[in-house]
Structures are given as structure tokens and as C-alpha cells.
């Protein structure tokens, strides 16, 4: 019985991992399909090229990637993709601003799911434009510690020297030894290409909404409520990316 119990536990654990991987693949496929609406050739479509690279980094099967491209470009048997990218905005506990990027084939369903989640966790889904002015669109490039020559972590001096040659306006060293490089919205492709040419190993890159300023909560309970809201929103199938001005 002990062996059976252990095997059951392993199967349950594997099922959880498989479910999480499946959810990631679903989100990535949606992102690829939406990007492919502007053209199915990644060589001439930076958004699609970025989405494909993210999918490959997550070890998404090539067949899944091809199906998502075909769906978005209208080359599969079901015709063009009906997904659309929509931005939603709202407030969390304590007035924290929340900006959500969703990929959906049903606006009403997505809005209802978001409203229910906000209400359940002490927040409120707002009108378009209610918090967007508190954020700006930015470029972020993630560097691997594997590209470093300084004991397994990115050398700050070497990075700073290299960034002077690129259209970067900031960076942050992270705990795993890597780094994040920041730049203007339009600089994303040039940043990742320039850093790669300089010998850095690129783990990923993306456009993100980042808060102009952050706010802190009055107590730990309020902060925990905000984090629970953000986690619950992130679990929704249609949610692609979440940004907030909660101080981390």
C-alpha cells in the first residue's frame, strides 16, 4: 500500500506540473496567434519573433508554435484567429493601481471574470484610462549569469561600460547573478541585438508597463490582500500580463 500511495502522490504531482505547463503553453500560443495577425513570417514581424523566442525558451513544442502561427495568420482550417489584445485597468486594496493586458476571444467573459476577481479581493475594475497614466511602456532585456566572467554573476562595471554604447537608460542586478537592462519602448530590438553582439547571453526580452512611482501599504495585512489579488488575476486564463504600482 505504501508503494501505491507514493506512486499516487507522484502521479498527482506530475499532473499539477503538467497542468501548469499546459497553462503556460496556452498563454504563449495566444500571444503567438495575436502577433501572427500582422504577418506569419517572424523575419519581418518583431512581435511574432519575440513571442516565438519566449515559447522556445519555455520549451513549447515546435508543432504547437506552428499551429499558433497558422491560426493567427488565417492559414489553418478554422480561419483567422479571433483573439484580441485588450487592456483593463482597476484598483486594488489601498488604492493600488493595476493594469492588465489580456488576450481574449470574448470581451464580456473576460470583463466578468476580472470584475468578480477584483470584488472578491477588495478591489474594483475601473474604466479605461483610470490608471494608465500612472504607467509607461518600457523595454526590458534579461541577461543570464552564464554570460558573466566574474564568478558566475554579471560584472556591474563591464555591463555599465557596454550600456554606454546602447540606447539603455538603466539596469538592475538580480539575485541569480543575472541582470535586467531597461530602455525606451522603441529600443527593444536594438537593445537585445546590441547586447548579444557584445557577448551577453540573452534569456529574454519584452515590452512591459512599469509604474512611474510606487506606493506602499499601511500594514502587512493590506499588502497581503494586494498580493492575493494579483495572484488571483494572474491565474485567469485570459490574463497575459499584470502590472501594478505596489511597492515591492
Curated annotation (Swiss-Prot):
Keywords tagged on the record: Cytoplasm, DNA-binding, Transcription, Transcription regulation
Gene3D superfamilies (alphabetical): 1.10.10.200, 3.30.70.980
InterPro entries, alphabetized: Integrase-like_N (IPR017856), TACO1_YebC-like_2nd/3rd_dom (IPR048300), TACO1_YebC_N (IPR049083), Transcrip_reg_TACO1-like (IPR002876), Transcrip_reg_TACO1-like_dom3 (IPR026564), YebC-like (IPR029072)
Pfam family, one: TACO1_YebC_N
GO terms, molecular function: DNA binding
One GO cellular component, as annotated: cytosol
Cellular compartment(s): Cytoplasm
Family: Belongs to the TACO1 family.
Any GO BP annotation: regulation of DNA-templated transcription
Protein name from the UniProt record: Probable transcriptional regulatory protein P9303_05381
